[in-house]
Amino acid sequence: MPKTTQLFGYHSKRAKLTEFAGYEMPLWYTTTAAEHMAVRNASGIFDVSHMGRFRVEGQKATGFLEELVPTAVKTQPPGKAFYTLLLNDRGGIIDDLIIEKLGEESYLVVVNAANAKADMEHMRAHSPSGLVIDDRTGSTAMVAVQGPGAVSSLQRLTDLDLGQLKRFRCAEARVAGEEALVSRTGYTGEDGFEVIVYGATSERPDGAMKVWEKLAETSTPCGLGARDSLRLEAGFPLHGSDMDQGTNPYEADLAWVIAAGKRGFVGSEALEASGAQPPSKVRRGLVLDFGIPRHGFEVLGDAGAAGVVTSGTFSPVLRKGIALCYLAQGSSEPGSRVGVTIRGSSQPASVTKPPFYDERSYGWKRQKDN
Amino acid sequence: MEIKGYHIPDDLMYTKEHEWAKEEGKAVRIGITDYAAKTLNDVVYVSAPKVNGAVEQAKSMGTVESIKAVSEVYAPISGRVVKVNGVLDSHPELINKSPYGEGWLVEVEPSNLPAERKSLLDARGYAAYLETLLQK
């Protein structure tokens, strides 16, 4: 039996369902294309309660996380949320995650649903005695509100001044009367928030359901189909598809998460060795002239095999096929032309560094008068 | 007729792979069913054979793609393609809006229709098949 989130009662009546990471989740409510464009042009809401949420608390919390991730932790102020990676001893990516710093020694770690168990085991294996790592996945719900209309959609439900909450900041607040943690983060490339509703279990889903239904009055409910096409259009890698334990941050084009000069974290020695030379392959974007690339499709350069597509879709904004892929050094220069083999024929494509959309028109940096 | 919200016109022939075929004079018009279109959810790309290309019954003759998925289209009958619905290049969503009308894919001049039509389903047969499929 797949697990369900606190909001399953809403999805089961209205959405086409799919199993993902052991959870029965909404794939789409209307169409993926319509939900995608609702987020780019107005605002959409996503049930992301399946994601893993771990509370890390106690005197040793900061020291523990500092030794666990390549990002600086101690110097982050409370109220900051930051993107980082869990690495294995070889510098390979166990997962990507967001850490929300609630207090000097208090954190909420938000991880991919598919990796939650492996992440917990990795953290427990490295944790000092006396440190509390508490799985809050089942006792909280999580809703993402994303799009240029996200501020106005969420502001109706809270006294927290969302205009004052900058990107990658978080604050505890009441949302629709429920105690919650609000962070200005997301996985769509748009402005928006992720709201973690406290005290929400499968037995007592009412508070989370109230938050969701109030948001649904002004935002479009979106399924995992749109979540995937939106993150891909923004160029965000999905762990398990676009990177795994055999990929290091240099190859994944995520070297920016490694704090300059930081040493002594899990995987740092391996990264020092691999960072000294250019990676043999690197993550890039592809825009196709025709056709839709999919996971596993081969990429050909002038000199033959150049790489492989790790995720691909149709971009509703560009109205073209787009992909994330890994390319060998000789073919990875943005602007290069390569071919993607689709059912036996090579389709021409351009190498890019995502996001795929024009940032003047879409995404959180967009010009406001658009 | 209609089975659980999926429209099945009475006057078409069907395959178990969810294509339909209809005689239009000397040619046979081919498309995908309402069920196939709704299962794909949002058709965004169509790859059909070219005019004069040969298609063979039960063999792939192209693909219909949504944002998330690729679906092969199998030729319900054999023959030579005489017309392609070029409007789908710019408006693939017509397959969702009107799978049996404006969303048709190709017209084929059949090479062996009398024999091949025996392996196609009528509307009642396809409806019964769809019902067993939806019970699973």
Regions found by a protein language model. Name each.
Chain B
Residues I67-E102:
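Mid-chain, well-packed structural core segment of small domains
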Residues K50-V64, A75, R80-K83:
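Short, well-structured beta-strand-loop connectors
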Residues M1-Q57, K97-S98, E102-N112, K118-K136:
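Acidic, low-complexity mobile loops and tails
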